[in-house]
Amino acid sequence: MAKKTGLKIDGAAELGKLLQSLPEKLRKKAAREATRRAAELVFKQAKANIRRADGAYRVTLKGGETITRQPGELADAMIMTHVPEAKSYLSQHKVTFARKKHNDVWKIAHFIESGVNVHRITSKNGQEYTHPGHRAYPFLKPAVSKNKAQIYRLIKDGIGDGMKDVLKKKK
Protein backbone atom coordinates (compact mmCIF):
# COMPACT_ATOMS: atom_id res chain seq x y z
CA MET A 1 0.00 0.00 0.00
CA ALA A 2 1.02 3.61 -0.39
CA LYS A 3 2.94 5.21 2.43
CA LYS A 4 1.70 8.34 4.11
CA THR A 5 4.06 11.28 4.10
CA GLY A 6 3.65 13.77 6.90
CA LEU A 7 5.55 16.59 8.52
CA LYS A 8 6.55 17.15 12.11
CA ILE A 9 6.43 20.81 13.02
CA ASP A 10 8.53 22.26 15.84
CA GLY A 11 6.22 24.04 18.25
CA ALA A 12 3.20 22.05 17.09
CA ALA A 13 2.23 21.21 20.69
CA GLU A 14 2.21 24.90 21.65
CA LEU A 15 0.30 25.77 18.50
CA GLY A 16 -2.22 23.03 19.28
CA LYS A 17 -2.76 24.43 22.79
CA LEU A 18 -3.23 27.93 21.39
CA LEU A 19 -5.73 26.69 18.81
CA GLN A 20 -7.59 24.65 21.47
CA SER A 21 -8.16 27.85 23.43
CA LEU A 22 -10.02 29.37 20.46
CA PRO A 23 -13.69 28.84 19.62
CA GLU A 24 -14.25 25.67 17.58
CA LYS A 25 -15.42 27.44 14.43
CA LEU A 26 -12.37 29.73 14.42
CA ARG A 27 -10.03 26.83 15.15
CA LYS A 28 -11.37 24.68 12.31
CA LYS A 29 -11.37 27.54 9.80
CA ALA A 30 -7.77 28.48 10.60
CA ALA A 31 -6.54 24.87 10.51
CA ARG A 32 -8.37 24.09 7.27
CA GLU A 33 -6.92 27.17 5.54
CA ALA A 34 -3.42 26.21 6.69
CA THR A 35 -3.58 22.59 5.52
CA ARG A 36 -5.21 23.60 2.23
CA ARG A 37 -2.38 25.97 1.38
CA ALA A 38 0.33 23.46 2.25
CA ALA A 39 -1.39 20.61 0.38
CA GLU A 40 -1.87 22.83 -2.67
CA LEU A 41 1.88 23.48 -2.85
CA VAL A 42 2.70 19.76 -2.52
CA PHE A 43 0.00 18.87 -5.07
CA LYS A 44 1.35 21.26 -7.73
CA GLN A 45 4.96 20.20 -7.18
CA ALA A 46 4.14 16.45 -7.17
CA LYS A 47 2.09 16.81 -10.36
CA ALA A 48 5.05 18.50 -12.04
CA ASN A 49 7.40 15.74 -10.78
CA ILE A 50 5.39 12.77 -12.13
CA ARG A 51 7.21 10.83 -14.81
CA ARG A 52 5.35 10.81 -18.11
CA ALA A 53 5.64 8.24 -20.88
CA ASP A 54 6.98 9.33 -24.26
CA GLY A 55 3.94 7.96 -26.04
CA ALA A 56 0.89 5.74 -25.67
CA TYR A 57 1.58 2.24 -24.33
CA ARG A 58 -0.37 -0.98 -23.80
CA VAL A 59 -1.06 -2.54 -20.42
CA THR A 60 -2.56 -5.93 -19.66
CA LEU A 61 -4.86 -5.78 -16.65
CA LYS A 62 -5.38 -8.54 -14.09
CA GLY A 63 -8.36 -10.07 -15.92
CA GLY A 64 -6.39 -10.30 -19.17
CA GLU A 65 -7.93 -7.18 -20.71
CA THR A 66 -5.45 -5.07 -22.68
CA ILE A 67 -5.85 -1.30 -22.62
CA THR A 68 -3.88 1.61 -24.03
CA ARG A 69 -2.65 4.26 -21.62
CA GLN A 70 -1.87 7.80 -22.69
CA PRO A 71 1.05 9.92 -21.44
CA GLY A 72 0.08 12.00 -18.42
CA GLU A 73 -2.80 9.81 -17.23
CA LEU A 74 -1.31 9.50 -13.75
CA ALA A 75 -0.84 13.27 -13.45
CA ASP A 76 -4.39 13.83 -14.72
CA ALA A 77 -5.77 11.45 -12.09
CA MET A 78 -3.99 13.25 -9.21
CA ILE A 79 -6.32 15.21 -6.94
CA MET A 80 -6.14 17.15 -3.69
CA THR A 81 -8.98 16.63 -1.25
CA HIS A 82 -10.02 17.71 2.24
CA VAL A 83 -10.58 14.89 4.70
CA PRO A 84 -13.73 15.79 6.65
CA GLU A 85 -13.70 14.90 10.32
CA ALA A 86 -10.07 13.77 10.27
CA LYS A 87 -9.49 11.96 13.56
CA SER A 88 -6.73 13.37 15.77
CA TYR A 89 -6.16 16.30 13.41
CA LEU A 90 -7.77 19.71 13.38
CA SER A 91 -7.77 19.57 9.61
CA GLN A 92 -6.29 17.29 7.00
CA HIS A 93 -5.89 17.55 3.25
CA LYS A 94 -4.40 14.79 1.15
CA VAL A 95 -2.90 14.43 -2.28
CA THR A 96 -4.22 11.22 -3.83
CA PHE A 97 -5.57 9.80 -7.08
CA ALA A 98 -9.12 9.73 -8.44
CA ARG A 99 -10.38 6.15 -8.24
CA LYS A 100 -12.84 6.07 -11.11
CA LYS A 101 -10.90 7.87 -13.83
CA HIS A 102 -8.19 6.82 -16.23
CA ASN A 103 -8.56 3.01 -16.20
CA ASP A 104 -7.56 2.55 -12.54
CA VAL A 105 -4.20 4.25 -13.06
CA TRP A 106 -4.28 5.12 -9.32
CA LYS A 107 -3.38 1.50 -8.55
CA ILE A 108 0.16 1.94 -9.91
CA ALA A 109 1.04 5.30 -8.33
CA HIS A 110 2.81 3.82 -5.30
CA PHE A 111 4.79 1.43 -7.54
CA ILE A 112 6.10 4.39 -9.51
CA GLU A 113 6.90 6.32 -6.31
CA SER A 114 8.79 3.49 -4.58
CA GLY A 115 9.84 1.13 -7.39
CA VAL A 116 9.33 -2.61 -7.86
CA ASN A 117 11.74 -5.49 -7.19
CA VAL A 118 12.28 -8.35 -9.63
CA HIS A 119 9.51 -10.90 -9.01
CA ARG A 120 7.75 -13.91 -10.53
CA ILE A 121 4.22 -13.72 -11.90
CA THR A 122 2.14 -16.86 -12.45
CA SER A 123 -0.82 -16.61 -14.81
CA LYS A 124 -4.09 -18.46 -14.35
CA ASN A 125 -3.03 -21.10 -16.89
CA GLY A 126 0.16 -21.83 -14.92
CA GLN A 127 2.70 -20.01 -17.07
CA GLU A 128 5.39 -18.15 -15.14
CA TYR A 129 6.97 -14.87 -16.07
CA THR A 130 9.80 -12.97 -14.39
CA HIS A 131 8.97 -9.31 -14.10
CA PRO A 132 12.22 -7.30 -14.31
CA GLY A 133 11.01 -4.69 -11.82
CA HIS A 134 11.87 -1.02 -12.19
CA ARG A 135 13.59 1.68 -10.23
CA ALA A 136 11.68 4.24 -8.20
CA TYR A 137 10.62 7.50 -9.79
CA PRO A 138 9.58 9.45 -6.70
CA PHE A 139 7.30 12.41 -7.22
CA LEU A 140 5.55 12.94 -3.87
CA LYS A 141 8.47 12.66 -1.43
CA PRO A 142 10.59 15.24 -3.27
CA ALA A 143 7.58 17.57 -3.40
CA VAL A 144 7.45 17.49 0.41
CA SER A 145 11.16 17.36 1.25
CA LYS A 146 12.25 20.15 -1.13
CA ASN A 147 9.54 22.50 0.11
CA LYS A 148 9.55 21.93 3.89
CA ALA A 149 10.45 25.52 4.79
CA GLN A 150 7.79 26.87 2.45
CA ILE A 151 5.22 24.39 3.79
CA TYR A 152 5.91 25.53 7.37
CA ARG A 153 5.52 29.16 6.30
CA LEU A 154 2.26 28.42 4.45
CA ILE A 155 0.85 26.64 7.51
CA LYS A 156 1.81 29.53 9.78
CA ASP A 157 0.42 32.14 7.38
CA GLY A 158 -2.70 30.07 6.72
CA ILE A 159 -3.53 29.84 10.41
CA GLY A 160 -2.98 33.57 10.83
CA ASP A 161 -5.04 34.49 7.77
CA GLY A 162 -7.79 32.05 8.69
CA MET A 163 -8.05 33.63 12.15
CA LYS A 164 -8.06 37.16 10.66
CA ASP A 165 -10.90 36.25 8.26
CA VAL A 166 -13.08 34.88 11.05
CA LEU A 167 -12.35 37.86 13.31
CA LYS A 168 -13.25 40.29 10.47
CA LYS A 169 -16.60 38.55 10.01
CA LYS A 170 -17.35 38.90 13.74
CA LYS A 171 -16.99 42.71 13.61
Name every feature range the model reports, one short phrase each:
Residues 2-8:
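Short, compositionally biased, intrinsically disordered N-terminal export/targeting signals
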Residues 5, 17-20, 24-131, 161, ...:
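Short, low-complexity, charged/polar segments at coil/turn and helix-coil boundaries
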Residues 11-12:
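Small-xxx-small helix-packing motif
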Residues 21, 26, 140-142, 152:
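A general, composition-driven signal for non-globular sequence regions
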Residues 128-147:
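Short helix/strand-capping connector loops at secondary-structure junctions
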Residues 143-171:
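C-terminal or internal capping secondary-structure element at the end of a domain, subdomain, or sheet
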